[in-house]
Amino acid sequence: MIIKKILPVFIGLLIVFGCNTPNNETTIVEEDYGNPPAEGFNLAASDKKAIEIADEVMKALGGRKNWDLTQHIHWNFFGSRQHTWNKYTGDVRIETPSQELIMLFNINDRTGRVMKAGREITDADTLQQMMNSAYSAWVNDSYWLLMPFKLKDSGVTLKYVGEDTTQLGEDSELLTLTFDGVGVTPQNKYQVWVSDETNLVNQWAYFPNATDSIPRFVMPWADWTKHGDIMLSGNRGERQITDIMIFDELPASVYTDFAPVDFSSLGAK
């Protein structure tokens, strides 16, 4: 269970996010920049139409170039955990107020520091357990916010199902995502509806196992809003992702110091 007291685990995938600083010295037009798949994306088994739709989604989100240039992302996951992620370095800050818990770690090497109830955890075994927990929480919570950017991720096979309508009656194209050998629960399956009108994701369904025919849940992706140079959605129907902010720069101490941070004063885009 990743989301204790809130939800069962809905995603355990290892999401391969780019952590390299883009080359800002080269001017690249969006058409030439493209939307290349992550290494390990199952191109051979994926449908051409599904890939074309995924590329249209990326354009609607602001374009691959703007996504790659986005560095710091901050959000509150369903009122439970607050995340701040440096996409270039892999550094993450997770705060869980209900547990008086702050975790500072790096998703690439899964090392870091943890403070619980005002005291830093120094026991090696306990710290490693906390790092594993932090990583799982980040994988889960970031996918709930950033899934549409990850349609061509490593390990993903993308299939086109056909035309469909959402529960709210929106005309859409339906995709299926399955996974191979990545993450915590690679047996999961998702169906993703893409709006004919906006090319943005407007609904998803989660299946604990790829062989399941009935989803565990179906939820909307609504209220798309521009943050910085990209589009993000926090409305999942009964659940809300809030306090979404994009930063070009943040003090290094955000990722290294347990001291409280007032993100509203740090100049979100």
Where are these regions (language model features)?
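N-terminal mature ectodomain segment of secretory-pathway/periplasmic proteins
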Residues: 39, 45, 51-122, 161
